[in-house]
Amino acid sequence: MTYKQRNTNQLAIDLITLSRFNRYNPLLATFSGVWATILAGSHKITHSPNSVTSEYVLSQALLCFICSFVFCGAGMVWNDWIDLHIDRQVARTKGRPLARGAVTTSEALVWMAFQFISSWVLVSWMLEGENVQAAMLPVTLSTILYPFAKRPIFRRLHIYPQYLLGFTLAYPSLIGTLAIKPEGNAQPLWASINQSLPMFVTVFTWTLYLNTAYSYQDVVDDQKMNVNSAYVLAGSYIHHLLVVLAVLVLGAVGWQLYGQESQWLWGGWMGVWTWSFLGQLVRFDKSRPESGGPLHKENFALGVWTVFVCVVELLIGGNGC
């Protein structure tokens, strides 16, 4: 009994590790939805003060956080299963539970299915059964395709895995927008898509930036295996690529904030991100691929900071001053 109990406990630990729940990475998948929910709620409170409460907005943001977190866990399992033969050859990934044989394929797939179904149920609850397929199917498809985009065949199509990852992490901005229903509940889906577009572009470009820097740590092994990736293509121009991506991110943030008309957001979001990006680009060293790791962590901190900025914007009633 003791031996079986020890195995059960170890399996639970390995499954948590498989979904990266022991690390901060899945939290990156929660930012776009949480930001979008809070800012949509802030906008609604500003223009219709009695239509919704801050408590309701924050409860919807929490649901969006949980949905995104759990869905990301399922995506991590799928990625490791498809990339199993690659992970076993890369120094940074060969210790993952599937790669080292700590979790069987059957166990991993059951765990993945449980997380996916849970996230679908939570999204349905949050959206009160409306637009659930529109919220879940596109991001599910991009998650399925993501690991395959690392194959050389996708290079011929000029499709890189960062594109699909960016789409996957940015798409919850639509879910967050849908979570705050407009007055009269009459807004069509296309209008919600249009409303969420600036946030989508912000998170999409931000993901390209931070993932390119982070994944550059594997550039030596990936070049040997001819892995399809933007940082492999960039080669010695990796620093130039990061500068271009940083400019695109800040431009997208400006687009998002232009519609918010908030001095607080301009200072707390745009100001802090601009200063941070300048420091990151100075510290990144293409001759030391490992320098991309700290940059990735700093961007996670920016994501957490921006949640705080959005919450303050909500609590001050969207006045931004």
From Swiss-Prot:
Name of this chain's protein: Polyprenyl transferase cle5
Chief localisation class: membrane
One GO CC annotation: plasma membrane
E.C. number: 2.5.1.-
Job of this protein: Polyprenyl transferase; part of the cluster A that mediates the biosynthesis of chevalone E and its oxidized derivatives that possess a unique five-membered lactone ring and can synergistically enhance the cytotoxicity of doxorubicin (DOX) in breast cancer cells.
GO biological process: terpenoid biosynthetic process
Cofactor: Mg(2+)
Superkingdom, natural source: Eukaryota
Disulfide pairings: none
Keywords: Membrane, Transferase, Transmembrane, Transmembrane helix
Keyword Signal listed: no
